Design a protein with these regions (language model features):
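Short secondary-structure boundary/capping segments
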Residues: 41-44, 105
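Short helix-capping segments at alpha-helix termini
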Residues: 27, 105-106
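N-terminal subdomain of nucleotide-sugar transferases
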Residues: 1-41, 48-53, 83
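An amphipathic, basic-hydrophobic alpha-helix
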Residues: 61-87, 95-105
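Residues lining the SAM
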Residues: 91
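Short glycine-/acidic-enriched loop or helix-start segments at secondary-structure transitions
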Residues: 15-17, 44, 97-101
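A short acidic, often aromatic-flanked loop/helix-cap motif at beta-alpha or helix-coil junctions
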Residues: 42, 57-63
Length: 106
């Protein structure tokens, strides 16, 4: 199965869970596409079937935090079309589920 996993790249908590899940699913033969704005700290290189897709986020001086949701939705759509992803697992409701909803609506 082709699975997209969206997570934060943190070295603790959800970033660890999502990254470990991605590596375990790849080890079972699934085609995994991990999306985040930075490479997760626990992600090891050279794992067959596991590909990292960076989400480019543009910083605007107007906003305190970069507008990640639309950039993520756009990247999810690109990965879905490039890799023919069957499903996405989004590891947080906000903003990841919002981005998934936007990507599906595009």
């Amino acid at each position: 199965m082709r699975i997209g996993i969206v997570c934060y790249p943190t070295v603790g908590g959800s970033g660890v869970v999502a990254t470990e899940m991605a590596m375990a699913l790849a080890a079972r033969g699934h085609d995994i596409h991990l999306l985040s704005y930075d490479r997760p700290g626990r992600l090891r290189g050279g794992i067959p079937g596991l590909r990292f897709h960076e989400v480019a986020v543009t910083a605007y001086p107007l906003f305190r935090y970069p507008p990640y949701d639309l950039a993520l939705a756009t990247r999810m759509l690109e990965v879905r079309e490039e890799a023919k992803v069957d499903l996405f697992h989004v590891h947080y409701a906000i903003p990841h589920a919002v981005s998934a909803f936007l990507a599906r609506s595009m």
